[in-house]
């Protein structure tokens, strides 16, 4: 077991480490693992620049359904985990969070309940966020044929996020600091550029 980032040396993958820690903290309980992952995705959606401006808030389905009894008759989990309140005032985004093994392949039956329950006029967007990398062509095609289509957010998208996953594991929600060259690096860059210019 890895006790710190330092033990990994260079080339570690903070998202993988974070997901492993969520799994360990859940002690094999699928429900707890799912809830922890949903919290992570809610936090990510409100911080990640690509998505944060889309929503005025992101709620659990249970909390959202309690606020909107006129739209849904039950608060029970029907395949939708989170609901984004669209900041443009145009409805809601249905979000399903799937904490799968990295190598898992998901059949269409694995997403049918989400597709059915989110097929409502007040859901103007649909996101499926998953930690696996393998999706059959049939499932991807099904997502695109839906109205509205389903946006698939993969492990790769999460890993390449501007959210600092190592900081998140420590309880901080922030973006990765932008790197700027040090003085000696700036000097080396100038010399390289100068070398290119003199070669022309």
Predicted regions, residues:
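ATP-dependent helicase/translocase motor core
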Residues: 2-27, 44, 51-52, 61, ...
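Catalytic centers of nucleases
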Residues: 33-121
């Amino acid at each position: 077991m890895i006790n710190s980032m330092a033990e990994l040396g260079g080339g570690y993958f903070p998202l993988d480490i974070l997901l492993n820690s969520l799994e360990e903290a859940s002690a094999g309980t699928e429900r707890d693992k799912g809830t922890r992952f949903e919290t992570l995705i809610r936090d990510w959606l409100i911080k990640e620049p690509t998505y944060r401006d889309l929503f005025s808030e992101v709620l659990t389905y249970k909390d959202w359904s309690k606020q909107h009894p006129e739209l849904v008759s039950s608060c029970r989990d029907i395949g939708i985990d989170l609901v984004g309140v669209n900041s443009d005032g145009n409805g809601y985004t249905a979000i399903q969070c799937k904490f799968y093994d990295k190598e898992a392949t998901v059949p269409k039956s694995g997403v049918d309940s989400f597709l059915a329950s989110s097929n409502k006029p007040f859901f103007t967007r649909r996101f499926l966020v998953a930690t696996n990398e393998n999706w059959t062509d049939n499932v991807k095609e099904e997502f695109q044929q839906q109205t509205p289509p389903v946006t698939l957010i993969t492990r790769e998208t999460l890993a390449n996020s501007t959210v600092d996953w190592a900081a998140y594991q420590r309880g901080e929600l922030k973006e990765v600091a932008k790197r700027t060259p040090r003085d000696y690096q700036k000097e080396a860059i100038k010399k390289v550029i100068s070398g290119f210019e003199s070669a022309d």
